[in-house]
Curated annotation (Swiss-Prot):
Keywords: Cytoplasm, Ribonucleoprotein, Ribosomal protein. GO terms for biological process: translation. Residues 8-19 have a biased composition (Basic residues). This is Small ribosomal subunit protein eS1. It is found in: Cytoplasm. It comes from Schistosoma japonicum.
Amino acid sequence: MAVGGQKKVTKGGKKGGKKKTADPFSKKEWYDIKAPAMFPKRTCARTLVTRTQGTRIASEALKGRVVTLSLGDLSEKNEEVFRKFKLQIEDVQGRHCLTNFHGLELTRDKLCSVVVKWRSTIEAHVDVKTTDGYLLRFFIITFTPSVPRSERLHSYAQTTRIKRIRARLVEIIQQEVSTCDLKEVVNKLIPDSIAQDARKAASWIYPLGETFIRKVKVLKRPKADLARLMELHGESKSTAPGETVSRPDHYEPPKVDSV
């Protein structure tokens, strides 16, 4: 007695056979990312995007993309690798993506290495508007230094002094940023001069140790302007003024018989 039914024999194996897998990178192309003129290294990275197909345009897909690069990649200085700059693509010209400043942040390992026990950690944040219409939020962090040759293990600051230090830090950031445009602000963020000026101004309240601008966020930006972006990249086209020609009223150009 048969236990199972006889299997149907098909010719040529499974239906359809094995499908060929296409290489996903065959439909993509590379674009160079150009940093603003404030950074020493302009062409700093490359990015992939799907090629233009139908109504999907590659340049439009790139606009708004945010890339994160360390200051070491933007300036070729290995001691600045713990500071990350965020750049946003605002325009595409050929195979070059023109970017604008989008934020700043310290790496996680650097932030953990500067936090030490038995010392006061003082943090503050403030929203400042630049002269060209950018609303930025600054986060600053500082610490009280360890006292050498002291019987006490800790060097905590009093709460009243911490409040005064925090207010002084906020005041210095507002003074440094509110009178500058975005280009000048980025030029101050690259050497971290804002944090050092704030530390010097607040040290008379209580001695301070390492001070950093921990994070910068762009909360609001003005309407996109290609001329401003080209000026930020140092590629603004200067048009030479033309010479004015005086002509009488009701002037008509002469007729040309042949062209």
